[in-house]
Swiss-Prot record:
Record SUPFAM superfamilies: Thioredoxin-like (SSF52833)
Domain of life: Bacteria
Gene it is expressed from: hupG
Organism: Rhodobacter capsulatus
Family: Belongs to the HupG/HyaE family.
InterPro entries cross-referenced by the UniProt entry: NiFe-hyd_mat_HyaE, Thioredoxin-like_sf
Protein name: Hydrogenase expression/formation protein HupG
Residue runs in coiled coils: none
Length: 138
């Protein structure tokens, strides 16, 4: 008897999932690899959303979130710019913001943390939460 084994489509741990990589290659979003990059990006004028992907090999929601964020940005008529958080600063950033689950979207304005959205949600929930976060003074 042969056991059927479904191939794992997620990249091995430590590799960037193609849908996450697309955010930097196709959309041109910066990848923040250190505290300097993070500070420089989040202190720019305006609103910013950081995508914290987590490990796509262990978290099957990561590719979905990588598809949702560009759509969310478009729904808000580019009211915020976006960046992808690199592995080197992910843990510290999650602990600092207290948004611990991944994937997550972390919103900043002029260097101030406004709030975060953890895990995959219904579209209406994304719209409501993002509206609430962007309305915050910071």
């Amino acid at each position: 008897m042969h056991d059927f084994h479904m191939p794992d489509t997620a990249p091995p741990s430590g590799k960037t999932h193609p849908l996450v990589a697309r955010l930097t290659t196709e959309f041109g979003w910066p990848r923040l690899e250190n505290a300097h990059d993070l500070r420089e990006f989040t202190t720019r004028p305006g609103a910013h959303c950081l995508f914290v992907p987590g490990d796509a090999a262990r978290n099957l929601e990561t590719p979905d979130a990588a598809v949702v964020l560009p759509e969310l940005r478009q729904a808000f008529q580019n009211a915020f710019d976006c960046a992808v958080v690199g592995d080197g600063i992910e843990t510290e950033l999650r602990e600092t913001t207290r948004v611990l689950k991944t994937p997550s979207f972390l919103f900043f304005r002029d260097g101030d943390f406004l709030g975060g959205i953890e895990k995959i949600r219904d579209w209406d929930d994304y719209i409501a939460r993002t509206s609430h976060i962007l309305a915050a003074k910071g």
